[in-house]
């Protein structure tokens, strides 16, 4: 029964793997709910800041913030948001494929691309393909912290404000629902005039500025862009946990199928061995 012993060992090994994937599935499900709550909580803030900035812009049409001005620089920036860890299906592969397409599109027009990586997977990929990585942020954990994101992202925001790059793109995995996530590459800068339209209300707005309107608008638009990046990272984290939960569930189900198949093989092997022994006993008795 050497073969039977080997099969039992395989069954035990797969059962242990199944326990691990099941535990990871449950942990991911718990983290997913928290990540979704953070993602939803961030949306009203970004919308409120955008609306206030839009009202201020309408009240001061003579001032146009650098983030809303186009320029002719032959360079662009892209912020690539991925995960720090794997075991989340094809999520990172999909977003990096979209990034590759965007990089080729920009480089084909002679545009020099500067990259900021958020997440280990994106950083490793950009280094492998020889992209120009000007800053990165890794080890964010399960909760996005704006103070960890501001430093790396500010490199591209400052470059745009100074006219060194003509656009900033943001690539991440957009959360649709638990079973569906979508890889996107969105233009972050310049901000479009449609994007900065204020919500129509039935009353007028009158502000008292301290120290002045330009300073307030400058600060608000920077906060708005930062909130968009935070929102993207929050959505990416919610997508990560959803994708990991689905991937670990699939792994657990597959492990169960493998165990059933191995048990069937073991039972057939054991039955064949017993049949052989009985045949030998009968043959021996007949010979006597």
UniProtKB/Swiss-Prot annotation:
Q: Which Pfam families match?
A: ATP-synt
- A Gene Ontology cellular-component term: proton-transporting ATP synthase complex
Record bears the keyword Cytoplasm:
no
Question: What SUPFAM superfamilies has UniProt attached to this entry?
Answer: ATP synthase (F1-ATPase), gamma subunit (SSF52943)
| Biological processes per GO annotation | proton motive force-driven plasma membrane ATP synthesis
Q: Name one GO molecular function term.
A: ATP binding
Keywords on this record? ATP synthesis, Cell inner membrane, Cell membrane, CF(1), Hydrogen ion transport, Ion transport, Membrane, Transport
Q: Where in the cell is it found?
A: Cell inner membrane
Q: What is its main location?
A: membrane
Annotated membrane topology is: Peripheral membrane protein
- Transmembrane parts of this sequence: none
Q: Does the keyword Ribonucleoprotein apply?
A: no
Q: How does it assemble?
A: F-type ATPases have 2 components, CF(1) - the catalytic core - and CF(0) - the membrane proton channel. CF(1) has five subunits: alpha(3), beta(3), gamma(1), delta(1), epsilon(1). CF(0) has three main subunits: a, b and c.
Instruction: Indicate the family of this protein.
Output: Belongs to the ATPase gamma chain family.
* Stated role: Produces ATP from ADP in the presence of a proton gradient across the membrane. The gamma chain is believed to be important in regulating ATPase activity and the flow of protons through the CF(0) complex.
Question: How is this protein named in the record?
Answer: ATP synthase gamma chain
Query: What species is given as this protein's source?
Result: Acidovorax ebreus (strain TPSY)
């Amino acid at each position: 029964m050497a073969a039977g012993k080997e099969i039992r060992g395989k069954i035990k090994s797969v059962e242990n793997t199944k326990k691990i994937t099941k535990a990871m599935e449950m942990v991911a499900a718990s983290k997913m709910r928290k990540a979704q709550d953070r993602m939803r909580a961030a949306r009203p803030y970004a919308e409120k800041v955008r609306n206030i900035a839009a009202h201020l812009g309408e009240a001061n049409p003579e001032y146009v913030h650098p983030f809303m001005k186009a320029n002719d620089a032959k360079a662009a920036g892209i912020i690539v948001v991925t995960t720090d860890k794997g075991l989340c299906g094809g999520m990172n592969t999909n977003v990096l494929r979209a990034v590759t397409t965007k990089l080729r599109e920009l480089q084909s027009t002679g545009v020099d691309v500067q990259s900021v990586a958020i997440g280990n997977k994106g950083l490793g990929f950009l280094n492998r393909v020889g992209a120009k990585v000007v800053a990165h942020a890794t080890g964010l954990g399960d909760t996005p912290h704006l103070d960890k994101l501001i430093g790396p992202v500010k490199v591209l925001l400052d470059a745009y404000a100074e006219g060194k790059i003509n656009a900033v793109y943001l690539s991440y995995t957009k959360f649709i629902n638990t079973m569906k996530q979508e890889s996107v590459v969105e233009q972050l800068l310049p901000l479009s005039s449609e994007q900065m339209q204020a919500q129509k209300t039935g009353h007028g707005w009158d502000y008292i500025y301290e120290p002045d309107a330009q300073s307030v608008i400058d600060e608000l638009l920077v906060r708005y862009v930062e909130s968009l990046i935070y929102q993207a990272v929050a959505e990416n984290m919610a997508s990560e946990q959803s994708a990991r939960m689905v991937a670990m569930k699939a792994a657990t189900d597959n492990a169960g199928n493998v165990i059933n198949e191995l048990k069937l093989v073991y039972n057939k092997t054991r039955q064949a061995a017993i049949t052989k022994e009985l045949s030998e006993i009968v043959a021996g008795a007949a010979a006597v």
